[in-house]
Amino acid sequence: IFLAGSTFGSIFRVTTWGESHGKALGVTIDGCPAGIALSEEDIQAELDRRKPGSNPYGTKRKESDSAMILSGVFEGKTTGTPISLMVRNTDQRSRDYGNIAYSYRPGHADYTFDAKYGFRDYRGGGRSSGRETIGRVAAGAIAAKILESLGISFCTYTKSVGPVSIKKFHPEEIAENAFYMPDAQAAQEASAYLEQCMKDHDSAGGVIECRINGVPAGLGTPVFEKLDAVLAQAVMS
C-alpha cells in the first residue's frame, strides 16, 4: 500500500522524509519565493532548540542534528526552486529495540503501522518517531524568514506543565529555562513537579501557546478550509 501523508500545504508545500534509525532525515520545501536570505545557521538555530540531549527532561539520545542544505539556495539566497535539507542520524542504537520486533508498545504506532501496511520499522518507531519533527522545524525556520519579510512575527511558549501554569508573561525569560516558559517562577515549579513525576515513574502533559502578530485580517474562508481548521490539521498531524 502506498505510504501517503508525508506532505502538507498547498502554496508552501512541506514534505518530510526519513526514519529514526535510518541514515538521515530531512525535508523538501516547495513554494518558497526567490531572494529570501537563508543560511544553514538560520535553520541550525531552531534545530538546536529541539535536538535530543539538550534538555534533562527529554530523550537521552545524543545527536548534533547538523543541518545541510542540498538545494534551492545560491549565494545565501533562495532561488525559488525546491529547497531540500538533510540531517544525518549518528546515535542510533537499533539493538536496543530487538526485543520489540515481534511485540507492540502501548501508546506507540507499532500496531497501527503493522495493521495498515503489513510491515513496520520497529527501530525507534521508524517514521512515527519524534525525530520526524526535524523536517517540520527546518521548514518552520524557513517559513519564519518569509513571514518576517511580510512583517509577521510570532512567539511560542509553554503555558503549563501538569498543574503548574504561568502567572506572568516575560518573553525574555522564554529561552532562559528548560521549559520555554515566560515565567521564571513557574519554570522552577514545573521543574520540581517533573522531578517528582520521574521519581514516581509517571508522566505529565502540558499546554503550548502561540501568539502571532501582524497577521492581516481576512485570512481563511467562511465555510471549508477555515483558518482554525487548517491550523488544527497542521498541529494535530
Where in the sequence are the language-model features?
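N-terminal, positively charged regions that mediate nucleic acid binding
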Residues: F2-R61
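Conserved phosphate/anionic-ligand binding catalytic regions in large, soluble enzymes, centered on
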Residues: F12-C32, R131-I146, F224-L227, M236-S237
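Glycine-rich, mobile lid/loop segments that gate access to catalytic sites or pores
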Residues: A115-V223
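Flexible glycine-/small-residue-enriched beta->alpha junction loops
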Residues: T90-G125, I166-F169
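Glycine-rich, N-terminal phosphate-binding loop and its surrounding beta-alpha-beta segment
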Residues: E46-P106
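Short, hydrophobic/aliphatic alpha-helical segments
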Residues: F2-W17, F119-D121, D228-A232, S237
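Short beta-strand elements
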Residues: F12-G18, L25-G31, I83-L85, F113, ...
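Short, conserved charged micro-motifs
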Residues: G35-E40, S94-D96, G220
